[in-house]
Amino acid sequence: MKYIFAPPANKGLQQLNHALFESSHTLPALKIPAHASGIAMETLRSHILVAPRLRTIVDDPTDKKWRLLLLDPSMEASEINDLPNPLKEFALKHEAKLVKHTIELKYDYWTSDQVLRSILPDEMETPGAFETVGHIAHLNLRDRYQPFKHIIGQVILDKSSHIKTVVNKLDNIDHTFRFFQMEILAGINDMNAKLKEGGCFFHFDFSKVYWNSRLQGEHDRIIKLFGQNDLICDVFAGVGPFALPAAKHKRCVVFANDLNPQSFKYLMENIKLNKLETRILPFNMDGRQFIKQSLEDLNNPAIWNKITKQKPTSNDKKRNRKVESPTVAPLTDQPAISGIRHFKHYVMNLPATAIEFLDAFHGLYSGMRDVIMDSDLPTIHCHCFSNAKDVKADVIERVERVIGMPLGSNLIMVHSVRTVAPNKDMLCISFRLPSALAFAEPKILGKRKGLETEENLVSQSDVSKSSDNILEKDT
């Protein structure tokens, strides 16, 4: 049976002191010949000490020819004859002696959970799993943990070798640009995260953009729905968690947009970092207006050439030389497209408000019924939150209210992404754009203040220049 030691109780401690977590534990032990160690481990397993990160057999400090076999701490015996039969027989056969051995356990031995349990009041649970963003541990502590937040941060920093900075999310959130206000609890003041997800490298300032490592599974799920060389419109792209893997692994051409200038800055940098300039075109504009002009931009030769005129990157050349996988179709620099170009998928990952942007699809294909078939209409993946009892019905009803018509057979699925808080779920509704909505007479949607669409598009040559400037500023 595994034995778990516990550190000394330090209830209410708010400033970390390693010395307060030192403890001594005296255990029964058999002093055995060194050559009998292997036999002892094989035959006495049910009677010896089994504890995390502790050796069962240690050197005898008084004689190198002998070893100390540490026994189950719960065993009560003052002499050999008091031992259970297997131990007694082994001891008599090998002339072993029953002794006491003291082990010293210090702060470094205890896990973060053990340390925090010894500190926090009994009625408080230790904080659950935290999000890791590169070298940053991201906590979301509730109010009752506020008196202990700094010591919690220090313990996590001490016990996680890859963590250099521990931050706590504050209540304030920037609703326009979707990033959280944070405070540093422990470690260095460095919010520039570097990480790898979905086979792509990402770099960004975590304090200025939105990133959630817990959504990697959702990123992967959506990307698996894309086909090779699909045209993708990522309306709220952030720093590229959907756009980059889709371009790299599915060879999709992605129009990726984000309103946050900082997200846009790092999106451009990450495109260059992953050598995906021939696959992703970045935009920095309001999501509603981006949707409204997406089809026009896709069929604008000047805009399309921003990608097609790019020289193939080394990644493109390597991929095009590969013939090892018979399941992957031969790849060209760009998908061969005749007639009207149209996106296969729209991704709308802005859970708090994405549903409100669905009105932008009204009349998107107006006047194109002769050249666009119903089967060509895109699939929309719209992320949202719900705290309703029936979340699926709630999401469907909200979408139908915004688009002004029932989804009917156009509904594909409502996928449960994760529970973000008690009685609050994140979901993704996927549906085909209804033809009645797509081909309707367009509504006039006002542009949001400060939008100048000609300046919102950044060419890939500008991306390279901008990224170079970014790197210079960061050094």
Curated annotation (Swiss-Prot):
It is found in: Mitochondrion matrix; Nucleus; Cytoplasm. CDD domains: AdoMet_MTases. InterPro entries: MeTrfase_TRM5/TYW2 (IPR030382), SAM-dependent_MTases_sf (IPR029063), TRM5-TYW2-like_MTfase (IPR056743), TRM5/TYW2-like_N (IPR056744), tRNA_Gua_MeTrfase_euk (IPR025792). Residues 456-469 have a biased composition (Polar residues). GO terms for cellular component: cytoplasm; mitochondrial matrix; nucleus. S-adenosyl-L-methionine binds at H219, D258, L259, D286, G287, N349. GO terms for molecular function: tRNA (guanine(37)-N1)-methyltransferase activity; tRNA methyltransferase activity. PROSITE patterns: SAM_MT_TRM5_TYW2. It catalyses: guanosine(37) in tRNA + S-adenosyl-L-methionine = N(1)-methylguanosine(37) in tRNA + S-adenosyl-L-homocysteine + H(+). Its main location: mitochondrion. Specifically methylates the N1 position of guanosine-37 in various cytoplasmic and mitochondrial tRNAs. Methylation is not dependent on the nature of the nucleoside 5' of the target nucleoside. This is the first step in the biosynthesis of wybutosine (yW), a modified base adjacent to the anticodon of tRNAs and required for accurate decoding. This is tRNA (guanine(37)-N(1))-methyltransferase. The gene is TRM5.
